[in-house]
């Protein structure tokens, strides 16, 4: 599950997310667009759960959920001021930034599962039941695998439609490696 997520995968996910959901605070859209426009920043972005445990974390929520609209955590300080967080992001480009997105169907979204990383800053005693944690990781791995397979099949179909033999063969090899 700890396969690094590429900058392009993160950008594709943000584009998909912004096209399908409306964030409660417009500043969140500005922050995500700013991050997307700088590859060096995107390398430092990690989509996680429970970002409040991270040294530098942002929580953003959409209109379709009953969660806080926006929170920025830095060390032990929390603010709801999006402009302060934007300023911090610009000034500290070399620091990792952990983003938690709260939106409807987040846990059943293969798009989100494909970029979601394990939060390395979670307290060790947070999970009471190791069996539940293991089951959750297996479900997430299955969702990621299913998403990757479906995306490859779609891309293979498009390559066939274009009569692009080289791309078809490349994607077919990738699909065979998945299975």
UniProtKB/Swiss-Prot annotation:
InterPro entries: IDEAL_dom, UPF0302, UPF0302_N, UPF0302_N_sf, Virus_scaffolding_prot_C. Coiled coil: none annotated. Pfam families: IDEAL (PF08858), UPF0302 (PF08864). HAMAP family: UPF0302. Belongs to the UPF0302 family. NCBIfam families: PRK03636.1 (NF002965). This is UPF0302 protein RBAM_020740. It comes from Bacillus velezensis (strain DSM 23117 / BGSC 10A6 / LMG 26770 / FZB42) (Bacillus amyloliquefaciens subsp. plantarum). The lineage of its organism: Bacteria, Bacillati, Bacillota, Bacilli, Bacillales.
